[in-house]
Amino acid sequence: MAKEGGRTAPCCSRPKVAALTVGTLLFLTGIGAASWAIVTILLRSDQEPLYQVQLSPGDSRLLVLDKTEGTWRLLCSSRSNARVAGLGCEEMGFLRALAHSELDVRTAGANGTSGFFCVDEGGLPLAQRLLDVISVCDCPRGRFLTATCQDCGRRKLPVDRIVGGQDSSLGRWPWQVSLRYDGTHLCGGSLLSGDWVLTAAHCFPERNRVLSRWRVFAGAVARTSPHAVQLGVQAVIYHGGYLPFRDPTIDENSNDIALVHLSSSLPLTEYIQPVCLPAAGQALVDGKVCTVTGWGNTQFYGQQAVVLQEARVPIISNEVCNSPDFYGNQIKPKMFCAGYPEGGIDACQGDSGGHFVCEDRISGTSRWRLCGIVSWGTGCALARKPGVYTKVIDFREWIFQAIKTHSEATGMVTQP
């Protein structure tokens, strides 16, 4: 596939450009033996470990792992249930909580050996994780919290696996959208919900800031598909630390991230679904093979792809990517590289803002998480010049804060 430059200049006027070439959850019953058996399953080591916050299947009890005891505890209900449910959902990588409720420990059968956590409500306003504000307790109110999070990162259609550099198929990447200015595809983006898209800041230079001329296309893999759903743009919130917007001569692409608020909400279907964010504290794993997609150029000087392209590429450590043979200390802490040392498969012009997604099972079921945003690179698919991505895990709080702060905003908005 191909990459659009992480700059405001035309994609071929400078060397740096961006784009894509060529388990079981704990179900508390109050019966000690049953609880212990389920905890044993949860802590099995043959798969990647479950994340430390979970929702139980069936009744969506909010569970937090007590690492000291090796057990899962329920969260006692409080006056701040809405905030606690929202914080729990966000921590797991969901965009928001859709609902919450209480269950009574005496009737729901959850007063077993696993125990409970209580919330320090005074610490909630500044908390970024549940573990910051909980402590073991006896649940004096006798009621505990359940939560419903906005679903994400799951395909609604069975799809075949494709191994890199090929046409994609409808429904494989239902969170991928096309951002078009005056009808021309300029960047990709990722749906976080029906009305929010995450993309790259460099997609919105001064010359492309008339929002009425932007349209977002979703639900299709063919760039010219008449069946795509399209919506207008209400606002673009870009990171205030993206320095080229302050001074176009600055050759520094940190904080290359922006949110697009749609004029209305897209209908969620088999072909339109949101992607998950990384869970709080979730680390990128060097060497892990993930997927980058886009409609960008299939060669550096080639044409844009007609059908959405996808490629599987491994994450490269920043140590390697900052070596003299690669990018020589140009990879900053909030960036990462992915690709092959020999080149051949990469992002390219037109893929900018698109997603780098990784699959995991830390929530007990398979989900795709948005780990990177196509940002920049040198050429396309060149040896030792892999694609460079914005590291989404480092912008989780920026994303949540921007959505909460600017949900009613219009036009171009800066979020520090």
From Swiss-Prot:
Q: Where does this protein reside within or beyond the cell?
A: Cell membrane; Apical cell membrane
Q: Which reaction does it catalyse?
A: Cleavage after basic amino-acid residues, with Arg strongly preferred to Lys
Membrane-spanning residues? 19-39
Query: What domain of life does the native source organism fall in?
Result: Eukaryota
Q: Which Enzyme Commission numbers does its entry carry? A: 3.4.21.106
Q: Which residues are glycosylated?
A: N111
- Give ranges for the Extracellular compartment: 40-416
Q: How does it sit in the membrane?
A: Single-pass type II membrane protein
Functionally, this protein is described as follows:
Serine protease that cleaves extracellular substrates, and contributes to the proteolytic processing of growth factors, such as HGF and MST1/HGFL. Plays a role in cell growth and maintenance of cell morphology. Plays a role in the proteolytic processing of ACE2. Mediates the proteolytic cleavage of urinary UMOD that is required for UMOD polymerization.
Q: Which family does it belong to?
A: Belongs to the peptidase S1 family.
UniProt protein name: Serine protease hepsin
Upper taxonomic classification of the species? Eukaryota, Metazoa, Chordata, Craniata, Vertebrata
